[in-house]
């Protein structure tokens, strides 16, 4: 069996966040974790090539990335594609899932990957791949690789993977049963009435959606708050918010601040290249433009505090808990609406989860993020696409005046979203 392995820039040996923007390339044979996979597979398959792409480049150029990676994979004439494992890395998981989608649709061959259950790539792309459940981090590589290899061996032998060795794909298939449906239904009902254990044949999906709140009626009188999962904190990170899997959030006083500088603010986030945010934190938390709009009377007031956590790897449960507490505080201050910004993949999942909880509390909120598919999957209602993962509201390649103009345009789009009635999820392009 000919196998092509897809990896990101880190596991492909190119480098960390500073190389997350590299374009796709192909290398012969196994690379990085592919060496362990080769050993685990034995003679069941041969990794003929490895395709490597930077996480940020893939997610910021999704359609081009899928087409380019597909072309590189097609050249190798594989029988199967392996992606990852991605563990709980959100951008990596989304890239692995997108590769699975395009390969399964265009080449019609199986794709095997590995992800943590809360990786957003699972929910978005599970139907296109056999997804082996992994731990939260690469520390579980030792168990992930053998599990993926075992599943690949079954596919190579023309066998269906055993139930329980992969995450449910959400696909319905026809099967033959010994008893007709009416008899099985009555038996299940009797068990349920007696309080006995029973197993449904078709678990209903759970959709956690929050109806969008009415829009802000008059921006010129509205108090707007800034919230971020992008980790923007005062210099020195006084609350010691962790760079990954944050166990807390911070509430910080803006006072009369009208700009976030390299001397006063930084990011605590470990999920994206911090260079651009540390140079100008307004690229993640747009205080400068919001102050400008406040002075011009476009908004009534910028809330005196901002709220920040690190969304990188942060659990859904913690994101919900932080947002509920933040929402209660916002209500106490009579905040009318919220702009929430996010950066990387799991950060976007965290941010969108927080958006839903703030919305659930009755406050209209807009999510400004780059990885829009994650925000849509989680359930944010008002979404504004951002510039790039490490600088969602800026572009360091532009002169300062032009960059500020770009940021103002994005913030105005976010304010437009807050004043627009919506009856469901809406992306404001």
From Swiss-Prot:
Subunit: Heterohexamer of two alpha, two beta and two gamma subunits. Component of the glycine reductase complex, together with components A and C. PB is substrate specific.
Gene Ontology CC annotations of this record: glycine reductase complex
Organism lineage: Bacteria, Bacillati, Bacillota, Clostridia, Eubacteriales
Listed name of the protein: Glycine reductase complex component B subunit gamma
Top-rank lineage group of the source organism: Bacteria
Record-linked Pfam families: GRDB
Keyword presence, Oxidoreductase: yes
Similarity annotation: Belongs to the GrdB/GrdF/GrdH family.
Protein species of origin: Symbiobacterium thermophilum (strain DSM 24528 / JCM 14929 / IAM 14863 / T)
List of catalytic residues: 344
Gene Ontology MF, one: glycine reductase activity
Keywords assigned by UniProt, alphabetized: Oxidoreductase, Selenocysteine
Function: In the first step of glycine reductase, the substrate is bound to component PB via a Schiff base intermediate. Then the PB-activated substrate is nucleophilically attacked by the selenol anion of component PA to transform it to a carboxymethylated selenoether and the respective amine. By action of component PC, acetyl phosphate is formed, leaving component PA in its oxidized state. Finally component PA becomes reduced by the thioredoxin system to start a new catalytic cycle of reductive deamination.
EC number per UniProt: 1.21.4.2
Record field: catalytic activity: acetyl phosphate + [thioredoxin]-disulfide + NH4(+) + H2O = [thioredoxin]-dithiol + glycine + phosphate + H(+)
The keyword Electron transport is annotated on this UniProt entry: no
InterPro entries the UniProt entry points to: Gly_red_sel_B, Various_sel_PB
């Amino acid at each position: 069996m000919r196998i092509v392995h897809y990896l990101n820039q880190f596991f492909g040996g190119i480098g960390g966040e500073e190389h997350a923007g590299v374009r796709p390339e192909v290398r012969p044979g196994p690379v990085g974790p592919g060496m362990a996979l080769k050993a685990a597979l034995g003679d069941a398959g041969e990794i003929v090539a490895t395709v490597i792409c930077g996480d940020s480049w893939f997610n910021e150029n999704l359609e081009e990335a899928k087409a380019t990676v597909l072309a590189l994979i097609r050249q190798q004439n594989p029988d199967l594609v392996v992606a990852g494992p991605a563990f709980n890395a959100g951008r990596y998981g989304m890239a692995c899932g997108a590769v699975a989608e395009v390969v399964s649709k265009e080449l019609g061959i199986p794709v095997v990957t590995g992800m943590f259950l809360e990786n957003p790539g699972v929910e978005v792309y599970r139907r296109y791949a056999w997804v082996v459940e992994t731990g939260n981090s690469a520390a579980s590589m030792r168990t992930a690789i053998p599990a993926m290899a075992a599943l690949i061996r079954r596919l190579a032998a023309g066998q269906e993977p055993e139930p329980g060795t992969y995450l449910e794909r959400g696909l319905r298939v026809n099967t033959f049963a010994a008893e007709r449906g009416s008899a099985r239904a009555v038996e299940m009902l009797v068990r349920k009435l007696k309080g006995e254990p029973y197993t449904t044949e078709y678990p209903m999906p759970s959709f956690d959606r929050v109806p969008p709140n009415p829009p802000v009626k008059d921006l010129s009188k509205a108090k707007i708050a800034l919230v971020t999962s992008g980790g923007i904190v005062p210099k020195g990170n006084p609350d010691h918010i962790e760079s990954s899997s944050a166990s807390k959030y911070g509430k910080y006083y803006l006072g009369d601040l009208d700009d976030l500088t390299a001397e006063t603010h930084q990011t605590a986030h470990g999920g994206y290249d911090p260079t651009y945010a540390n140079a100008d934190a307004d690229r993640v938390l747009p205080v400068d433009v919001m102050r400008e709009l406040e002075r011009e009377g476009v908004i009534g007031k910028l809330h005196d505090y901002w709220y920040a956590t690190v969304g990188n790897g942060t659990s859904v449960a913690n994101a919900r808990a932080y947002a509920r507490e933040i929402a209660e505080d916002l209500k106490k201050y009579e905040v009318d609406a919220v702009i929430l910004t996010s950066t990387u993949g799991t950060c976007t999942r965290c941010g969108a989860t927080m958006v839903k909880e703030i919305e659930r509390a009755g406050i209209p909120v807009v999510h400004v993020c780059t990885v829009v598919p994650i925000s849509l999957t989680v359930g944010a209602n008002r979404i504004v696409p951002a510039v790039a993962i490490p600088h969602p509201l800026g572009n360091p390649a532009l002169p300062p005046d032009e960059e500020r103009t770009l940021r103002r345009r994005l913030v105005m789009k976010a304010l437009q979203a807050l004043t627009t009635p919506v009856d469901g999820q809406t992306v404001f392009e």
